[in-house]
Amino acid sequence: MVSMFSLFLLLIEQSPLVASLQQSQRHIVGVPWEKQHLYDSNEPDLTKWHCLNHEDIVLDISQINDGVCDCPDGSDEPGSAACVEDIFKSVAEGGGKVNKYFYCDNKGFIPRYIRKSEVADGICDCCDCSDELLSGYELFDAGSNCSQLKNEFDIMASKELSSYREGKEALEELERKYGTKEEAITRGNCLEEDKEKASAEIKVLSNRLSENRAKLEQLRGEYFNQLSHDPILYQFEQLNSTRLGSDILTSFTMVSRVSKGYQDIFKILSDLSEAYTPSLNDKVVNDNIKKFRKVRRRAEKAKINADSKIDDEQADNLYLYFTEEVPQIFLKRESENTLRYVIGKSNFVQALVEGKINYTNDILEYIREFRLIMDDISQNYNVNFQDAGVKSAVDSYKNYLGEYGELAELEPAHPSESLLRSLSEVTSFVNENAPKVLPPDAVESEQDTNSDHIGTSGDLRNKLKEILSKLNIFSSRKDLVSLEKRFRSCESQVSLLENELKQKMDYKKLLDETEDEGTNSTAGNLTELLELMGSQSYCLDDILDNYVYTICFQRPMTEGVIYQAEDKVDGKKVLIGRFKTSGFNVDLNMEKYAEHLKATYDEKSDLISNLAAIQDDDGNMQHYVFGNLNELNNGLVLEYENGDQCWNGPRRSATVFVRCSDKFKIRSVHEATKCNYIFDVVGPLGCNKTFEYEPPKFNLSE
């Protein structure tokens, strides 16, 4: 902490008693040493000074930093908050610039720029407290002094560099294990061999695909030709109930997610309502708990019952209904259930699908109300009360936002017109045609038998013809079932070959791009290493927030995948994406490294906040004055796309950022935009082998 004696000395320097001394020394607070000359007298009268952008406005030199904004460009107040930031303009003179930011000299630590809005607010944002010298306020937060921060920085840098060395050694070990070649000639030869092999595989796959497509067209013609002899089955094929089942499964995936989102935030607030301490009289918390209890009572009266497990079971059952149960009725002319049950279930399924999706809107409204309550608590609760129940709820809510952030942006869900139309068509078809292909129920059959009197030889002949006709249809249908199986099998084979061919072609393209980048590049080295690791199907997985995330490298790289699975027996598994490309992102590297430092060191001190700076020529970007520590990471980014379809949204995709460490681990996963995930991973692949530490420029002058 800054000592009271030091503060006294700093403040007394600005008092009227030493004003003349300050003028002779001419050190202007808030201005770096190389720009101090801009505040020397620029008038014949050495007691005068004119505004840097307005030579016609002449002031007494004592008016600089006097707390009154006299210059239109704000140049007379570099060390106070008197001028509104928007009026400042950069002034070029003698190759230097003056702009709208306050310069912290920070003797003993690292100089930096801060915003004028942070000046004279009673809080020392500069470790030398120079931003509060002219405020006249009593300080209520002096923070760490520059000497303390220097010691903390040295410790932090030592830990980061030690971790980097371990990561670099682990990377070199991976290269030895998987046999990467540093020699450009060897790598070039290997690359050429891989390209030739990939080209040969593409040729073989293309030929196989052409043959299978021709076979598929032949089977398709035979199948639909035979279908034309069975009008009911032909009509059913046009409905495409399998596609409908997939669409409903996709819709119910979001229904389940909304239910889980409701359950989780309801639990956070329920636990908080039991664990918080009312006697602390935190008005924000007490008022919001009352709101929660009112909303909870309203939800109970409305009989809101969100259960993601039930939603998942219903989704699976509906998928089986449309892809297996209904097709069996018309293809095999059989059902395990009575005709009455078949028709009743068809109508029930339609009502369930329509009602469930609409019911989700009610749940979303309650989620939004609960989130407003937790937003207010998280942002405005009194941290000084140290209420363990509140702190636990706020932490849980932060994790909740990371997992369910997109729910706040969801519009009211409505079944699509195409889904409703398909659902209605299948329901009507079942109701109309199931009685034509299934035997009547037992009671109805008995009534028909009692009322049917076969009294003539003509009646007997007619019955015999009907039986023989059914036998012929059965024999024909048996052939149709066999043909349908062969047709579907060939259709699947063509789809698999198309995917395999695309992956091989993408791999060949990646090899071509790697050759263009140059065999000595870091990208080339890592691409080769990823390929070699993929040849042994290298996977890493971790459990986060009740989900198992798995990232697998394959050879070729385009076969690499990311999966998300529920952490339970028979948990639902979804494909997040397939490997698309790799590269390096400098901006993301800086952002992720800053996040890492905050998460690792912020709770222990205010060091990281004292490393954040505004660059004097670019106030729109956050910069950090920790030297080039961020460059110990190479900024490796892996992109994945074409995952499973999100309900009412795009296909899933992901960006994987890899930070340097000696061991692989998935540290966090969050949804940046709808169905697009950011994976923060640590491991040797994120280490920059060519990194050499360049420390920041400390102000250690005596």
From Swiss-Prot:
Glycans are attached at N145, N240, N358, N520, N525, N688, N699. Residues 435-457 are annotated as: Disordered. Its main location: endoplasmic reticulum. Residues 163-228, 478-517 form a coiled coil. InterPro entries: Gtb1-like, Man6P_isomerase_rcpt-bd_dom_sf, MRH_dom, PRKCSH, PRKCSH_N. Residues 1-20 form the signal peptide. One of its GO terms (biological process) is fungal-type cell wall beta-glucan biosynthetic process. Subunit of glucosidase 2, which cleaves sequentially the 2 innermost alpha-1,3-linked glucose residues from the Glc(2)Man(9)GlcNAc(2) oligosaccharide precursor of immature glycoproteins. Specifically required for the cleavage of the final glucose. Present with 9760 molecules/cell in log phase SD medium. This is Glucosidase 2 subunit beta. The gene is GTB1.
